[in-house]
């Protein structure tokens, strides 16, 4: 499952956070 916050950051439930280009 992947969740995107309001700032467009890709937050995965495995704890990794990635910036959405």
Curated annotation (Swiss-Prot):
What biological process terms from GO does the record include?
Answer: monoatomic ion transport
Q: Where is the signal peptide?
A: none
Q: Does the keyword Plastid apply?
A: no
Where is the protein situated, by its record's location annotation?
Cell outer membrane
Single GO cellular component term: cell outer membrane
GO terms for MF: porin activity
Q: List where the protein spans the membrane.
A: none
Arranged from A to Z, the UniProt key words for this protein are: Cell outer membrane, Disulfide bond, Ion transport, Membrane, Porin, Transmembrane, Transmembrane beta strand, Transport
Protein task: Structural rigidity of the outer membrane of elementary bodies and porin forming, permitting diffusion of solutes through the intracellular reticulate body membrane.
What this protein is called in its record is Major outer membrane protein
Q: Which organism is it from?
A: Actinobacillus equuli
